[in-house]
Structures are given as structure tokens and as C-alpha cells.
Amino acid sequence: MFLVIRVRGTTGVIKNIADTLDMLRLNRISHAVLVEDTPSYNGMLQKAKDYITWGEIDADLLAEIIAKRGKFTGNNKVTDEYVAENSDYKNIDELAKAVIAGEVKLMDLDIKPVFRLHPPRKGYEDIRLSVKEGGSLGYRGENIKDLAERML
């Protein structure tokens, strides 16, 4: 499971890349979504790599993101009580583990698929360079945790 974050804006985006970003539901800067590690999603990530960054997410970070930035229908915050009432899981931590394992999707519980994060504290490295070149774009692997924690 990947966490995908949009880094760059909409100005000058080629139409097919803009369509890919729309399919990923990344409409604004600092929005984040979860995607599965499938060949079709990998192709979409490679196509939009000059506007996004992504990496593997673990259950602890996902639980923190859901608790702080998760919203359900009506723009209400996701709480342990909401998860216990509307699912088979007792709290957000158990839900996060189930989402990572692929047992359940956030949409099944009416949790919005897009997380609206803050811009990162201390800023991005460089929004025009890849991670390998010292920038912020492209595949990060496990280092997505550092960026996501700065954005919560």
C-alpha cells in the first residue's frame, strides 16, 4: 500500500497527466491518497511522477493520518467511537492494520479517500527535482513517513 502526496500545482500540467491526477483524486497541493501496489496504479504513479511523491506506508502512520486528518460524510472527524459503531473494528489502530492488509477499504466505512494535509513544516526540499537528485518528487520508499509526519 502506497501513500501518494501531490507536491506541485495545476499550472502548465499536460492534459493526460492532469487526467491521471484526477483519477488518483489528487486535485490540490498537499492532498494525499492511499493506493494499492498493482501494475495499473504503478503505471499511473510513473506517469504523474513529476507532480507527486509516494512511498510505502505502515499501519502506525496510517492510524495517525486517519485520526488527525480523516473525515467521513458530513465533513466530520473520524474517531474511535465512529469506527466501533460503523465497522467490525474497535478503534482506528485496528482499522489501519486491516486497511494495510487489504481486508477493508476506507470507502466501505464512508471515510473520504482524500486526506487534506498541511504543507510540510520546514518546507519541501525542491519541488522540481526528484528525490534522487535531492528534491521532493517521485518514489521515496520508507522515507514518505518523514514527509507525512511533517505534514500532519
Curated annotation (Swiss-Prot):
Keyword Ribosomal protein found: yes
Entry-linked InterPro entries: Ribo_uL30_ferredoxin-like_sf, Ribosomal_uL30, Ribosomal_uL30_arc, Ribosomal_uL30_CS, Ribosomal_uL30_euk_arc, Ribosomal_uL30_ferredoxin-like
Alphabetical list of NCBIfam families matching this protein: PRK06049.1, uL30_arch
Subunit structure: Part of the 50S ribosomal subunit.
PROSITE patterns, sorted: RIBOSOMAL_L30
Gene: rpl30
Record-annotated membrane-spanning stretches: none
GO MF annotation terms: RNA binding; structural constituent of ribosome
Domain of life: Archaea
The name this protein goes by in its record: Large ribosomal subunit protein uL30
Entry similarity comment: Belongs to the universal ribosomal protein uL30 family.
Classification via Pfam families: Ribosomal_L30
Keyword Ribosomal protein: yes
Keywords from the UniProt entry: Ribonucleoprotein, Ribosomal protein
GO biological process, one term: translation
PANTHER family: 60S RIBOSOMAL PROTEIN L7, LARGE RIBOSOMAL SUBUNIT PROTEIN UL30
Record CDD domains: Ribosomal_L7_archeal_euk
Any one annotated GO CC term: cytosolic large ribosomal subunit
